Amino acid sequence: MEDLILGDALIEMKNIADNSIDAVIADIPYGTTKCSWDIIIPLQPMWEQLHRVIKPNGAIVLFGIEPFTSVLRSSNMKDFKYDWYWEKERLTNIAQVKKRAGKTVETISVFYKKQPTYNPQMIKYEGKKRTNKVKNGKMGKLTDTQQKKVKEYKDTGFRYPTQVLRYQRDILKSNLHPTQKPLALLEFLVKTYTNENELVLDFTMGSGTTGVACKKLNRNFKGIELVQKYFDIAKTRIGETNEQI
């Protein structure tokens, strides 16, 4: 199920039922560009609506970039828990690299009141695999219990995710929206914070990447977009995804 809404997020969210959303995943405006739509949403009214619609154990996952991220965190320090860092494959401020560090990172801030769904998406490890062979050296011999644990250990070649996420942009789709995020990154977040058939809200959905990820992963989706152009793109993309499933 998907429900796509054209309109102002703060107004349209008032029509969403209390405690009906399993997770919020959104790339909200940072106020760092000259685009007409890149105006920071008033944060306190935003939090009022998000707290009302999210389930008690739902995660609110919001993209950002400094200095906006610091403002976002500070607006709800009580619920802020941690950040992910999306590391891009190329600089976004190449004209400034002689004056300041190159920008390759955007933040993804996670907020919640109670422990939400968390499904760790294991990352393929490219380094040397761990061995179950342990050499007894100067530190002394292993106990029988330790030896048993070592013998039972098998390296699968995968690791739990760390805060740094490396995803390349979707080159063929990157012109759909100025702040387009990789589909694989959104799939990672959707799988991490929701289970199948749950409902995800993106209240600034842009060209609909979160919605596409939800449809591919058998999640329900509710999206709100202010700009007609991007709403139409999102509607088309999500519709095409439905046809491909």
What are these regions (language model features)?
Residues 234-235:
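Conserved SAM-binding loop
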Residues 239-245:
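Generic C-terminal helix-cap and adjacent flexible tail
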Residues 1-223, 229-231:
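Core catalytic lobe of class I
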